């Protein structure tokens, strides 16, 4: 029997590929307004602090290839062809959907590399993808979230358990887990956006699976705008928890992200570590999902569930 061909649109935020991309990339994020020279220099210094340009572009490509391979190996009903579409740099979502149409794709599934749904992020990705798909006559079914997937929860719980195993007994007895995601403007909550609740649910499931005693939910990497953003920020939270509970070790799990990139390698591994050093506490962070086989298997399960429920 001939396999049914299905397009798989893997969407992500995107990241500069080289230093020259930094200005146009952030100009796109700022809706066409260039960052001022001081802000641009600050961004360049952040990238330099993590060893140059973020590894995110390469990891996104590796994740997409691994996911396509896993999907096609796991079943013989569909032939999946994966494409990458990015929000703020080429290949842009719209250009990728156009490429899918040129390749003769009639049906496709889209997946954002972010576990939690929000009107601010996942909804905007799916809107851009669906509008373009409609234009080209592609039936596109979008995955909205996957924050409670058992494999996703288990991946983080296993990493946390391994981290606790590395600690001294004193650290283990005086430690706290901080579960975080990218902060978003507080105004999203007024419209009933589920983002905050979904992160809290992820944290609860991970804590149960890993059998963690002390934990807190925090937010990170907020944008530089006048609007209030979701808090507490992970750095402030670290100080508050140290002052109120005297913890000797902090374990950071930025579960809203799926790869090593600037927000993790700088905002966690540099900024949070600086706070830990200041207060005399130990800093720990389990590995990110990247292309870990268990994580890729989880994404494949998410896509297959959507395929079985939606594909004609």
From Swiss-Prot:
Cited InterPro entries: Ferrochelatase (IPR001015), Ferrochelatase_AS (IPR019772), Ferrochelatase_C (IPR033644), Ferrochelatase_N (IPR033659)
UniProt GO MF annotations: ferrochelatase activity; metal ion binding
Residue sites binding Fe-coproporphyrin III per the record: 13, 30, 46-47, 54, 125
Gene3D superfamilies in alphabetical order: 3.40.50.1400
Reactions that this protein is recorded to catalyse: Fe-coproporphyrin III + 2 H(+) = coproporphyrin III + Fe(2+)
Keyword Cell cycle carried by entry: no
Keywords, in A-Z order: Cytoplasm, Heme biosynthesis, Iron, Lyase, Metal-binding, Porphyrin biosynthesis
Enzyme Commission identifier(s): 4.99.1.9
Pathway recorded for this protein: Porphyrin-containing compound metabolism; protoheme biosynthesis
Entry's family note: Belongs to the ferrochelatase family.
Role noted for this protein: Involved in coproporphyrin-dependent heme b biosynthesis. Catalyzes the insertion of ferrous iron into coproporphyrin III to form Fe-coproporphyrin III.
PANTHER family: FERROCHELATASE (PTHR11108), FERROCHELATASE, MITOCHONDRIAL (PTHR11108:SF1)
Protein name: Coproporphyrin III ferrochelatase
């Amino acid at each position: 029997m001939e396999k049914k061909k299905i397009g798989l649109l893997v969407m992500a935020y995107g990241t500069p590929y080289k230093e020259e991309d930094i200005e146009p990339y952030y100009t796109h994020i700022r809706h066409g307004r260039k960052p001022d020279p001081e802000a641009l220099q600050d961004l360049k210094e952040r990238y330099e602090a993590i060893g140059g340009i973020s590894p995110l572009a390469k990891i996104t490509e590796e994740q997409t290839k691994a996911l396509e391979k896993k999907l096609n190996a796991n079943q013989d009903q569909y032939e999946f062809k994966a494409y990458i579409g990015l929000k703020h740099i080429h290949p842009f979502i719209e250009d990728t959907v156009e490429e899918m149409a040129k390749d003769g794709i009639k049906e496709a599934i889209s997946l954002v590399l972010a576990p939690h749904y929000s009107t601010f992020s996942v909804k905007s990705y799916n809107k851009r993808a669906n509008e373009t798909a409609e234009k080209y006559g592609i039936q596109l079914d979008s995955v909205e979230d996957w924050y409670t997937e058992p494999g996703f929860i288990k991946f983080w719980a296993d990493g946390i358990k391994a981290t606790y195993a590395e600690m001294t007994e004193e650290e283990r007895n005086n430690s706290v887990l901080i579960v975080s995601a990218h902060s978003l403007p507080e105004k999203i909550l007024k419209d009933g956006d589920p983002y905050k609740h979904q992160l809290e649910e992820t944290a609860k499931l991970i804590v149960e699976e890993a059998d963690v005693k002390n934990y807190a939910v925090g937010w990170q990497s907020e944008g530089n705008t006048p609007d209030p953003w979701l808090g507490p920020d992970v750095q402030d939270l670290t100080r508050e928890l140290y002052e109120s509970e005297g913890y000797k070790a902090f374990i950071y799990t930025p579960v809203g992200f799926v790869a090593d990139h600037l927000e993790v390698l700088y905002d966690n591994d540099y900024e949070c570590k600086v706070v830990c050093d200041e207060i005399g506490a130990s800093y720990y962070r389990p590995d990110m999902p990247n292309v870990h086989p268990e994580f890729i298997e989880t994404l494949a399960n998410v896509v297959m569930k959507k395929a079985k429920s939606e594909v004609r």
